[in-house]
Amino acid sequence: MADNDKNSCSCSFCGKVHSEVRKLIAGPSVFICNECIDLCSGILQEEGSSYKKGDTLDLKPKEIKKVLDEYVIGQEHSKKVLSVAVYNHYKRLSNSGIISDVEISKSNVLLIGPTGSGKTLLARTLARVLQVPFAMADATTLTEAGYVGEDVESILLKLLQAANFNVEAAQRGIIYIDEVDKISRKSENASITRDVSGEGVQQALLKVIEGTVSSVPPQGGRKHPHQEFIQINTDNILFIFGGAFDGLEKIIESRHQGSNMGFEANVQKASKDKDIFCYTEPEDLVKFGLIPEFVGRIPVITSLGELDEATLCRILVEPKNSLVKQYKKLFEMDNINLEFDDSALSEIARKAAVRKAGARGLRAILENLLLDLMFETPGTFNVDQIVISKQMVEESMVNSRLFLKH
């Protein structure tokens, strides 16, 4: 190429001519220089590595739990169990090329606890801490392949979407499946009839949990022969399951009937204190309706206790994204300072404890309590401070007592 021809060609991206760069590569009617190639390569590498921070093991179990403490109040044992399980999981991935003589199994986790005890929040916070893709699914929407409803590949698609279709990142992500107790089979004995939303789903999940290469349709929906698929290996995806398991406590109690008096007394005391789930054994889950193969793929089992009034009161104010902080921020956007008396917070926690809906009950109470205020005060120029009192919570008539500061 003559010098004049070289200088007439320029990079289609940065505009530099041939003499200003080391290399100019030609394509169909376009050119790109080595500098732009290096820049694009750096961007792609940065995006590809952004999800690999979970493998670096920068966070040790104590540090993981410390971050969980900032968002999740109470449930100390479960946070410790999760921190260790997750640390071991990503330690296993980081050393997969080093350890050859011993194969370390995945530390899939089962969280047992009542509604609103923090199961979903724990899983979601873990993914945020580790900076890995996170997907959540409801087991009650899943059906066996070939039947109406979502199949297990739809969960993997959600994980791929969370990873911006970065397959390598998705293969090291976390999947949380809630309401897993709802897919228990109808009886402990195998049934000759098809159970497409119970045992059938457990069988379908088995392959994904233990590790397989799944073909996922990128557009979702059911598979058909003429579509393209994304291949995703589930060997290194961490699965966390959650469920309330209503009725499991009776199975645990019956197992301990006739056992030595000391241990049985502990179980009876735990039953009264709502902590009986900490005595859960794999055989109890099988009797509940989970198939043995499914239970065998979940080596880590931990229970979350029912939240008491004192813990609910702490949940209102202590987490980084606590409900009180969220509502204060919403009112602050309208130039209104929202405050809560300590007695008001205690009353809100008491009402939530009575409802037995856990932390979810707190939001429902606050929404009802603040509804009229959130409707009336925007655009009201003579209101710049509102203080919520215990009486206002008791009566749920917040409009009747506004404390104004001019």
UniProtKB/Swiss-Prot annotation:
The keyword Nucleotide-binding is annotated on this UniProt entry: yes
Record-listed ATP binding positions: P114, T115, G116, S117, G118, K119, T120, L121
Disulfide bridge partners, by residue number: none
Transmembrane annotation, as ranges: none
Entry's Gene Ontology molecular function annotations: ATP binding; ATP hydrolysis activity; ATP-dependent protein folding chaperone; protein dimerization activity; unfolded protein binding; zinc ion binding
SUPFAM superfamilies documented for this protein: Glucocorticoid receptor-like (DNA-binding domain) (SSF57716), P-loop containing nucleoside triphosphate hydrolases (SSF52540)
Source organism superkingdom: Bacteria
Record's keyword terms, sorted: ATP-binding, Chaperone, Metal-binding, Nucleotide-binding, Zinc
PROSITE patterns attached to this UniProt entry: CLPX_ZB (PS51902)
GO biological process terms, semicolon-separated: cell division; proteolysis involved in protein catabolic process
Family: Belongs to the ClpX chaperone family.
Subunit structure: Component of the ClpX-ClpP complex. Forms a hexameric ring that, in the presence of ATP, binds to fourteen ClpP subunits assembled into a disk-like structure with a central cavity, resembling the structure of eukaryotic proteasomes.
The protein's role, per its UniProt record: ATP-dependent specificity component of the Clp protease. It directs the protease to specific substrates. Can perform chaperone functions in the absence of ClpP.
Descriptive protein name: ATP-dependent Clp protease ATP-binding subunit ClpX
Gene: clpX
